Amino acid sequence: MIRQCLGGWLLALSCVGNAMAAGPDCSRSFTLALHDHGLLYSVDTDSGIDKDFADELIRRSGCQIRVSLMSRARIWKLIESGGLDFSLSGIANDERNEYADFAWYFSNKYYLLVRKDAGIHRLADFEHNDQFQLGVIRSFRYSDSANRLVDKLSAANRVSQAGGLEPLYQALILRRIQGMIIEPFDYPAIDEKKIRDVTTIVEFDDPAVRHGLIMSKKALSPAEREKWRALVNEMRADGTVRRIFEKYFKPDLADSMVDFKTQP
């Protein structure tokens, strides 16, 4: 009897040890930065999708993670240098893949928000009028067609950069820019009458772009990045990510954003 109890106790300890080994190494504290961007995170309310996601990531990992607020441009610089462990809702490109790894948890499309009085009905209308200025957030990248538009207009000095959404909305209202690139997280601000009444949306003919937990390759080993990716995948599999998105979007839109293939 004693031998059976001892065997069961050792098995339990073994299971606990394996579970701890499978999770992230919490022997040090980590850093994670949010950025102020619509429904992803609002500094005014200290709430948003990425805030909820970060809270759940901290709870599940059991690690100490210091959360701060930064501009997107600073986030990418610190991720590259290893001065920041994590950020959220990031998208990949060839340059970023050199220094960052990603754990995907949603995807969304991008749209061109333009002034009605500019007479823009398709992308070519914007691209071919030298008087039109495009507003973007510094260090943001978008879908393929949107990126091509930004790069082409940047080369012609037709892009105005800002640190966040609010300055771009103001520039659009004041006719300093004729368009800006948006995503579903920006919808509440666009629904405000002063913006809705003067704008319309032009679609990019692009598929949805995956967004994920950003992990610094310099700060985190490949093995540890896989452990954090496994946590994110668990949050997707058990419906946690979906429940977070349904707090902020109608179910059909939430479904379209969280249902995607993890592999290209």
Residue ranges with predicted function:
Residues 68-69, 73-85, 125-127, 165-186, ...:
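Short helices/loops that flank or line small-molecule/ion binding pockets
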Residues 28-43, 124-142:
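Short loop->beta-strand "edge-of-pocket" segments that line small-molecule binding or catalytic clefts
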Residues 64, 141-157, 232-264:
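Ligand-binding clefts/hinges and TM-proximal coupling segments of bilobed small-molecule sensing domains
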Residues 51-60, 124-133, 140, 214-252:
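Extended ligand-binding regions for polar small-molecule ligands
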